[in-house]
């Protein structure tokens, strides 16, 4: 799925969420989240935030979303420790690999996962996790 297809799919999946575009990224907030402190989902399109995923490549973007500690552990093992400088965490994953669910390069310690340019099948498999992230954001 290219970036526009993903944006369309996410807007259809979360029609009541508020999407904010800033810093070459899209931030999804649950309806009613007036303070907008933490999105439940982001889509990053450039290396401005980190270079781990090499998003400067043609057609690359990264979909990021929160998981519960149990969801994270069942997929990747224990939550890693955050770096003191909040830099890229070494989880053993190639953060530039396309269409592969993996820990987020920086926010894995907070239970975030990501996928670089997911295919349609991968996206469909992620929908339950994305909906769960949205439900948590509503509370």
Where are these regions (language model features)?
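Charge-dense, helix-prone N-terminal extensions
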Residues: 1-139
